[in-house]
Amino acid sequence: MITKRIIPCLDVRNGRVVMGVNFEGLSDVSSPVELAEFYTNEGADELVFYDITASYENRALFTDIIKEVARKVFIPLTVGGGINTVDDFDRVLKCGADKVSVNSGAIRDPSIIGKAAKRYGSQCVVLSVDAKRVNGSFRVFAKGGREDTGMDALEWIRRGIESGAGEIVLNSIDTDGVRKGFDLEMLEAVCSFATVPVIASGGAGNIGDFIELFKTVERVDAGLAASIFHFKQVRIRDLKKELKENGIHVRI
C-alpha cells in the first residue's frame, strides 16, 4: 500500500492565513511563516501555500512571503495563486517552492501545463481543480470558486494529466470548510482514471474523516486540510498515530 500523505494548507490573503466556508466568509487565522514552521515540526509531509485572491485580483502572488516560508520549512512546498505563465512558474520555483500549483491560469491557457512540464518536469506541475456539483455533474470553477466555467471537472482533469500535470489537488467546493467529511463520490470518480497522485481537499472535520477517506478511496494519495489543523482541533501527530493503528501507511 502506498504511504499516505497529510498536508496542511495555508490559504493566504493580504499576507495572512485565512479560512472560510464554501470558499466564502474569510476570517484571519495566523501568520503563514509561523504556521509553516509549526507544521514542519508537527510532522506534516508537505505544505501547500495558496495566495487565494491573486487570480481574482489579477495580480502577482506574494513572493516575499514565499521566500520567508521556504526558509522555514524542510518538507516539500507547493505554491499556487496567480500562476498564469511559465515565467510565473520560474519565479515561484526560484523563491524556494518545490512544486507550483496552477488553477485559473490553466483554464485561461491550458497550454501552460505542457509548457511548464516540458521545462521543469511533470513532478513540479500541480493542477488544482475547484469543483462543484451543478445539475448532477461535477463542474470546474475558477477565480477562487467564484466563476462557473461550464467545464466538466472529470474531463478537465483527464486533459490536464494528458498535458503533463504530475499531481492533482481536487478541492470540493461543496464540502470546503463544512467539516463533515471529504467528497468521497467526487474523489472516487477522479481516482478511477487518474494516473498521477490525487490529493483530497475540502471537508475534513476530524480524524475519522481521514480514516474514511483512505479506506474508502484507496487510490487517493493524500489528505489536505486547513482549519482543523490551524485551530489544533486535530494534531497531525495524533492523526498519523490513529491512521497507523487503523492499518493505513503513513510516515511517523
Q: Language-model segments: which ranges?
A:
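Conserved anion-binding
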Residues: V12-M19, A97-L170, D174-T175
